[in-house]
Amino acid sequence: YRSALTKLAAPRIKKNRCIWLYCDSSKTVKDNAYYQFIHDCKKNDGIERYYICNKDADITGWFDDSQRAQLIEYGSVKHRLYALSADKILTSFYGLQDFLCYPNGAYKYFADLTTFELIYLQHGVLHAHLPTMYSLDRMAIDKEVVSTRFEVDNLITNYCFEDSFLIKSRMPRLKHIPKDKKPEKKILFAPSWRKFLVESDGKGGWIPKNAAFINSEFYKNVMAFL
C-alpha cells in the first residue's frame, strides 16, 4: 500500500515544479546546507526550496517567519515524498540516511522515481589526505561545491575528480565569519573523531564506545600530549 501510494503521489508533487532540498544530517546541525539555504532563499527564481529539519533539534533563532514556512520535518511523509520529487538535494553529509529518511534497504524500491542531482556541500575546506573516504569513486554524488583553488587542484590530482564535477561558487558560510572581532593569541587543539571508536545507530548518527575509547592508543596519546 505504501509503495503504491508513493508511486502515485511523488509524480503529482513533481509535476510543473522545481524542488530543491537542503540537508545537514539526520540530526540537523548548523552546517553548510543551512547557510546555503539562507543564501538561496533570497533568490526569486521560481525554485521551491526546503530545509530538512529534525524535530528534536534546537533551531531557536535560525530562521525568520518566511523561512520557517519552508521547513520539512526529517522522516515525515512530506520528506519522503519530496525527496523522491526533488530536482536537487544539497547536503553537507553524503551518507544516505543523512538526506534520505528511508530505512536501510527500502530506498531501492523507490529509486526508480528519483531524478535528483546530489550536490555535496562539504563541511569546510578539505585539507586532510582522505582519498579512501572522499574520492569520487567512493561517493554517490553528482557535484561538489568548492571554495578555493587548492581544493580544485587537490580533488582533481588526488581524488579522481574532473573539473566538470566541481561547482566553484564558494561556501556562503564564509560570509558569516565575524569581521569585528579582534584576533586572539590562542591555540585550539581539536582532535578529530575516530570511526573505530563509535558505531552507527542506523539512523545517520553515532553511538560512542566509551570503554574502547578509554583504552585506545588514540585517547592515551592525546592525554599524554596534554
Question: Language-model features: where?
Answer:
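Non-catalytic membrane-proximal stalk/linker segments that position and tether the catalytic domains
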Residues: 1-19
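Active-site and donor-binding regions of nucleotide-sugar-utilizing enzymes
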Residues: 18-177
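Generic detector of well-ordered alpha-helical segments enriched in charged/polar residues
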Residues: 2-6, 60-61, 220-223
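Conserved catalytic-core segment of nucleotide-activated headgroup transferases in glycan assembly
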Residues: 30-44, 172-226
